[in-house]
Amino acid sequence: MPSILPRFDFRAEYALASDIGATREQYEDAALLAPELGVFAVADGMGGHLAGEVAANLAVEQVKHALSGRSAQRAREAYVASADLDARRRVFAELKRAVERANAFIRDDAERNPEHRGMGTTLDVVWFARDHAFIAHAGDGRVYLARQRAVLQLTQDHTAQAVSRVDGFGRLLGPSQGSGITNALGINEVVTVDMLFVDVSRGDRLLICSDGVYGQIEGEAELSELLRSGAPVQAVGGLIARAALLGRDNATGIVIEIGDRFVKRKDHDRGLNAADLERARQSPLLVDLPLSFALTALSAAVEIEVGEGESLPREIANDLVAYILLDGVVRYPDERRVGAGALLYAESLVGVLGQGDTPSCEQTTRLLRVRADDFAEICTDPRLATELYRRLAMHLARMRANASRRA
């Protein structure tokens, strides 16, 4: 039965299921259903003598505690009231802080209790606000989005083999082969937290799950079939039944279906709908980038609309900016034209004020605008920074070669 989540524009129906696994003596996963906060999470604990169970439960408890606090709720309320980039960043900051708090709490517990030393846990959190899902990810749990005929793996596993299992469109390439986790809560003093958000629409389904679920799925087709079967309670039940039939590990999943929209807004934060995301990922900055990285990069962008004949400035509020075209046509004074997926003023993202003629919009045009300061902020993640700066370098080299040929 669909229900209302406070400060979320859609009704939602959700269900949880789990299984201990054929050969496990302890259940070391943990799940969080907190619809009153718009928060859902799954953790998969690691460590002997029940320590994994302790770590997983501490993770979800601390996330719930942090996101129910005054600071987090104020950030969410501010985003609901006005979904601008600053408000979006506040929500991200609170969500990241909640995961970091959980990491610190787990490590403190391990220091106080010798039998818990070495424990850790993966963690995937989905926090709904307005018409978006904000996601925090650490470890090898996963969040999937099923919409229309596609199933997208939104998160990227923090394992050595992760990149080889996901193609440039975020699709599964085959069953998991397993590998050591390179990042999780409790392992190190600083935990890497992947942050992303997606817009949601009526009919979308989100799956949050531990590796005991997806490890038994043979690819996108099987996952799609199971995830779309019946109501959320039937879907998650089918996924866990499949895991229990073939797997030995704990398996935990939450399925959330987005229902009817009951709040209409004029100041809609368009975010990343499916068509816009596909166009943006054609840009030289994001081409062939794993989906989770692309979503993180685009969380620093704001959508703008520029009228026919208007030019595109290189600076906004004393900060250099770059643009990715979503639709429309931009024309240069030398009659060159570019369309959807084009990246303009790429040099701005490395702090260089470009020279040359300023292009203008041939028609009303929608673009994503990225400030240099915001780009630098998302590049604090060394993995993402490596991918983005490599693409920027290649694009700028091509631009220089093309300019030389035109000269």
Identify the residue ranges that each predicted region occupies:
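PP2C/PPM-type serine/threonine phosphatase catalytic domain
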Residues: M1-G307, L320, V329, L349, ...
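Cyclic nucleotide-binding regulatory domains
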Residues: E310-T364, F375-I378
